[in-house]
């Protein structure tokens, strides 16, 4: 039995101790995004960030074995501080492009973030991305805790 689109869609919800605008900005500011994007223990660089609809980004992830894995995409929707939609593609493998939707909701003095990644192709790929995003979101929690405005 093959996996359905819903089976291969990743959805993660987290609550952050920061207002929606602060959480949203951490996705579109190069220095901030670079500080937390990627799984724990992985260094990332963002050589390209055009934070506008139709703008592109590129992230280079340095693995512990020294390999560099580039990810690139295009911003489809930027609706501050509520919604951010962008493509996510592993360079060199156009068949692995997916769509990420970040939705932010105010919850008192906190923010509920939902990350939905569609088009992952397989349950295994969904699970691998889930591990990576959960780790990156752990880093975002820590970053927002130590970098308050």
Description of each model-found segment:
Residues 7-13, 20, 56, 70, ...:
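Intrinsic-disorder/low-complexity, polar/charged segments enriched in Ser/Thr/Lys/Arg/Asp/Glu/Gln
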Residues 83-134:
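Beta-strand/loop substructures that line and gate deep hydrophobic ligand-binding cavities in soluble
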Residues 11-12, 31-68:
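Short beta-edge strand/loop motif at the mouth of beta-sheet-based domains
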Residues 14, 47, 71-76, 98-105:
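Hydrophobic/aromatic beta-strand elements that line small-molecule binding cavities or substrate pockets
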Residues 1-43:
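Hydrophobic ligand-binding cavity/cleft-lining segments
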Residues 66-78, 82-91:
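Contiguous, well-ordered beta-strand patches that form the walls/edges
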Residues 143-149:
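Short, highly charged C-terminal tails/helix-capping segments
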Residues 23-24, 33, 57-59, 75, ...:
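Hydrophobic pocket/interface hotspot
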